[in-house]
C-alpha cells in the first residue's frame, strides 16, 4: 500500500488464508536473528478482523521460528509468546502480556533480544516509550539455531493472519539500551500519532496545574481574584491574564479542547503552554484577608 502520509506500508486485510498467502516473509531471517543479540523495531496498527474474532492468540505481528521453538511477537490480544506451542497449534505454551494495546491506532514496538554469558535468550519489549514486558529466559538460543524463518502477520501452523498495517520495520544487529528503545518507540509513536500525544500531554498538564493550585491553597497561598486597572500595572502589562478566575477559565477551555476530536496538534500544545504561563504569572495577595492588589 502506498499511503500519502507514510509512503509505502504493508497492509494486511485478509484475516484467514489456507494457501500460505497474504502475509510477508522476512528474507535472510537466519542472518538477522541467528545471533546473540538484535533489536526488532516496528510501527504496527492492529485492525479488527472481519470474522473469527475470537481467534486472538493465533494472530501475531511477527513470528520468529526455529523448528519447534517460536517467538510470537505481539498477538492480537497484546501478548508475546515464546518456546514451544501449547495444546493449540500456533499458540505458544508460554506467554506474557504487554498490557492494553490500542486497536486501530499506530503503536511503536522495540523487541530487544540478548543472550548473556552463553545463556538462553532474554527478551525485553518496549511499547510507545515504555518498557511493557520482559522474559528473562525464553528457553532456547537463537544463536545456535540453523533453521530460522520469520514472518509478518502470520503464526506458523495457523491460517489466521493479524490484519492491520505495518511500517518502519528495522532489525538492528545489537540489543539497544533501555533508554534508546524507550526514546525510539516514543518518537515513532509521536510521529505517527502527533495529536494523540499532544492530547495526552494537555491532559497531564491540566491535572498538574489543578494539583498545584490545590497544594497552594493547602499552604495558605491566596491568588488575586480581581484584575488590576491599567494604571496599577508597572510596565506594559495591561490585560495580562494573572488572576485565579482567568486561570480557571483557561482550565475549563482546555477541558473542552481535549474532548474535541477535531482539535489540532498545534492547538493542543499551545493550550498546554498557555496554562504553564498563566500559572507562573498568577498574582499573589500579600495577606489572606486583604483586597490590596499584590504585585
Go through each PLM region and give its residues.
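Predominantly extracellular/luminal cell-surface or secreted proteins
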Residues: 65, 83-87, 126-128, 153, ...
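Extracellular glycan-interaction surfaces
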Residues: 1-21, 41-51, 70-139
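Beta-rich interaction/scaffold domains
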Residues: 191-295
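Flexible glycan-contacting loops in extracellular carbohydrate-active proteins
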Residues: 135-165
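Extended recognition patches within non-cytosolic domains
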Residues: 4-5, 168-196
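Short structured motifs
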Residues: 23-28, 91-97, 153-156
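Extracellular/lumenal carbohydrate-interaction signature centered on repeated Trp-anchored short motifs
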Residues: 28-40, 97-107, 142-143, 159-165
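Aromatic-rich beta-strand patches that line glycan-recognition/binding surfaces
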Residues: 41, 51-68, 125, 153, ...
Amino acid at each position: 500500500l502506498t499511503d500519502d502520509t507514510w509512503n509505502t506500508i504493508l497492509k494486511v486485510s485478509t484475516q484467514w488464508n489456507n494457501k500460505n498467502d497474504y502475509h510477508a516473509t522476512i528474507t535472510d531471517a537466519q542472518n538477522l536473528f541467528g545471533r546473540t543479540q538484535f533489536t526488532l523495531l516496528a510501527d504496527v496498527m492492529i485492525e479488527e478482523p472481519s470474522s473469527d474474532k475470537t481467534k486472538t492468540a493465533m494472530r501475531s505481528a511477527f513470528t520468529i521460528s526455529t523448528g519447534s521453538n517460536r517467538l510470537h511477537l505481539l498477538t492480537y490480544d497484546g501478548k508475546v509468546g515464546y518456546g514451544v506451542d501449547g495444546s493449540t497449534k500456533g499458540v505458544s505454551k508460554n506467554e506474557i502480556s504487554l498490557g492494553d494495546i490500542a486497536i486501530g491506532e499506530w503503536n511503536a514496538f522495540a523487541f530487544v533480544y540478548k543472550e548473556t554469558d552463553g545463556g538462553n535468550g532474554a527478551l525485553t519489549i518496549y511499547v510507545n516509550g515504555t518498557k511493557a514486558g520482559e522474559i528473562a529466559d525464553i528457553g532456547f538460543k537463537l544463536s545456535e539455531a540453523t533453521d530460522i524463518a520469520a514472518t509478518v502477520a502470520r503464526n506458523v501452523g495457523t491460517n489466521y493472519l493479524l490484519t492491520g498495517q505495518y511500517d518502519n520495520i528495522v532489525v538492528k544487529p545489537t540489543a539497544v539500551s533501555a533508554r534508546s528503545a524507550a526514546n525510539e518507540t516514543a518518537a515513532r509513536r509521536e510521529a505517527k500519532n502527533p495529536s494523540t500525544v499532544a492530547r495526552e500531554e494537555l491532559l497531564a498538564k491540566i491535572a498538574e496545574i489543578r494539583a498545584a493550585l490545590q497544594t497552594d491553597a493547602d499552604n495558605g497561598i491566596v491568588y488575586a481574584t480581581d484584575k488590576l486597572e491599567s494604571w496599577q500595572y508597572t510596565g506594559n502589562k495591561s490585560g495580562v491574564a494573572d488572576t485565579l478566575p482567568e486561570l480557571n477559565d483557561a482550565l475549563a477551555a482546555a477541558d473542552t479542547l481535549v474532548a474535541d476530536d477535531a482539535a489540532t496538534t498545534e492547538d493542543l500544545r499551545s493550550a498546554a503552554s498557555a496554562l504553564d504561563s498563566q500559572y507562573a504569572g498568577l498574582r499573589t495577595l500579600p495577606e489572606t484577608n486583604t483586597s490590596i492588589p499584590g504585585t
